UniProtKB/Swiss-Prot annotation:
Organism this protein belongs to: Rattus norvegicus (Rat)
Essential cofactor(s): Zn(2+)
Chain positions recorded as Zn(2+) 2 binding sites: 107-108, 183, 222
Any single Pfam family the record assigns to this protein: Lactamase_B
Quaternary organization: Monomer.
PANTHER family for this protein: BETA LACTAMASE DOMAIN, HYDROXYACYLGLUTATHIONE HYDROLASE, MITOCHONDRIAL
Residues the entry annotates as binding substrate: 192-194, 222-224, 298-301
GO MF assignments: hydroxyacylglutathione hydrolase activity; metal ion binding
Gene behind the chain: Hagh
Lineage start: Eukaryota, Metazoa, Chordata, Craniata, Vertebrata
Descriptive protein name: Hydroxyacylglutathione hydrolase, mitochondrial
EC nos: 3.1.2.6
Length: 309
């Protein structure tokens, strides 16, 4: 990430926010953390069936407004800054009906209560009773609709025990679908194992998300791409896909543009956590089994000192 005005604030809050995400202290920091994201640009992913507005939040989070083009009904993913969501809803002149919460950490679910006060009657979905303002608890393969869009809930426990990813598609459409992965799968990375194991993350990445169509758009919860790719380069220094993606991501960061979305097919070429079956990744980890490789490279990533280049 390029840090300009307020860079000290951003660095401090990035570290502090990660700790608070699992300690329940986020609400006390929410107002402070808006200091801020205005150097990061919104992005609209436009398709015939749906429009997805990427909304930067806090220091490196993303919220997402999903608009069904047929009905102009909308859902929002992880609305930690409710006022920004409301402004975007008004800009697009759509009807917000649904909140999709990936997990209970404050930087994802911390805006739910305020949003439902601003917009009474919202349906709030999630897989964990710790999620604020929850109205509909979902489990693996639960389904719901947003206008004419179909949403399938995918249980991916590990970062948190109740983590849900949301696979959004349009029945009968040939356009690529999208999966909102929260803190399970990032561009070139994955979430920390706060409440789970390497085996659970392996299943989440390879057996649940990895079996979705290859052209599925991966839409994640944070802008971590450059740092993730620097670790991927460390794991596989000879991987040209990593090198090319890193150069591209640095250019995007330099002008404040998102590196999201990627696709599942792309993730299998440069994401070391999706590549734990590859010999190059296993050799780096000193392992021969994908799950123990997952455990080893996650531990290494947790201690990795990101180079400044």
């Amino acid at each position: 990430m390029v840090l300009g005005r307020g860079s000290l604030c951003l660095r401090s809050l990035s570290v502090l926010g990660a700790a608070c995400a699992r300690r329940g202290l986020g609400q006390a920091l929410l107002g402070l953390s808006l200091c801020h994201t205005d150097f990061r640009k919104n992005l609209t992913v436009q398709q015939d069936m749906m429009k997805i507005e990427l909304l930067p939040a806090l220091t490196d989070n993303y919220m997402y407004l999903i608009i069904d083009e047929d009905t102009q009904e909308a859902a929002v993913v992880d609305p930690v800054q409710p006022q920004k969501v409301i402004e975007t809803v008004k800009k697009h002149r759509v009807k917000l009906t649904t909140v999709l919460t990936t997990h209970h950490h404050w930087d994802h679910a911390g805006g739910n209560e305020k949003l439902v006060k601003l917009e009474p009657g919202l349906k709030v979905y999630g897989g964990d009773d710790r999620i604020g303002a929850l109205t509909h608890k979902v489990t693996h393969l639960s389904t719901l609709e947003v206008g004419s869009l179909s949403v399938k809930c995918l249980s991916t426990p590990c970062h948190t025990s109740g983590h849900i990813c949301y696979f959004v598609s349009k029945p009968g459409s040939s356009e690529p679908s999208a999966v909102f992965t929260g803190d399970t799968l990032f561009v070139a990375g994955c979430g920390k194992f706060y409440e789970g194991t390497a085996d659970e993350m392996y299943k989440a990445l390879l057996e649940v998300l990895g079996r979705l169509p290859p052209d599925t758009k991966v839409i994640c919860g944070h802008e971590y791409t450059v740092n993730n790719l620097k670790f991927a380069r460390h794991v596989e220094p000879g991987n040209t896909a990593v090198q090319e993606k890193l150069a591209w991501a640095k250019e995007k960061n330099a002008i404040g543009e998102p590196t999201v979305p990627s696709t599942l097919a792309e993730e299998f070429t440069y994401n070391p956590f999706m590549r734990v079956k590859e010999k190059t990744v296993q050799q780096h980890a000193g392992e021969t089994d994908p799950v123990t490789t997952m455990r080893a490279i996650r531990r290494e990533k947790d201690q990795f000192k990101v180079p400044r280049d």
